[in-house]
Amino acid sequence: GLEKKDVTNAWDNKGDIIIGNDVWIGYEAAILAGVTIGDGAIIGTRAVVTKDVPPYTIVGGVPAKPIKRRFPEETISALLEIQWWNWSEERIARNIGAIQSGNIDQLEQGV
C-alpha cells in the first residue's frame, strides 16, 4: 500500500524570509527561504538572493552579490539609530522633507 508521510518534513525548510524597513525589491527578484534583507537595502531586478543582505546595501545578479553600500558607514549607523519608519504618521509628516532629502542632521533632530 501507500506509505503515509508528514509533508512538512518532505523538504529542507531553511526558515522565513525577513524583509527590513525601507527596502526596494526590483521586478521579478527572487528571495530564497531563510534570507534576511536588512533595512534600506536595494535588490536589483531579477536578482536571486541566496544570502542575507546587510542594511543599506545594493545587491544584484544571479546569485545576488553586493554592488555597493548606499551610504558611508556613519550615515548607515545614524539611519539605523533614527529608525524613522517607526515614527508616528504625524512625526513623519513633520519631517517628510528631511526623510526625502536624506538630511541626517535634520532627521536626528526630527521632532
Positions of predicted regions on the chain:
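ABC ATPase nucleotide-binding domains
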Residues: 91-111
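Proline-centered helix-kink/hinge sites
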Residues: 54-55, 63, 83
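Short, charge-rich, low-complexity interaction segments located
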Residues: 62-71, 75-76
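Nucleotide phosphate-binding site architecture
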Residues: 32, 50, 65-68
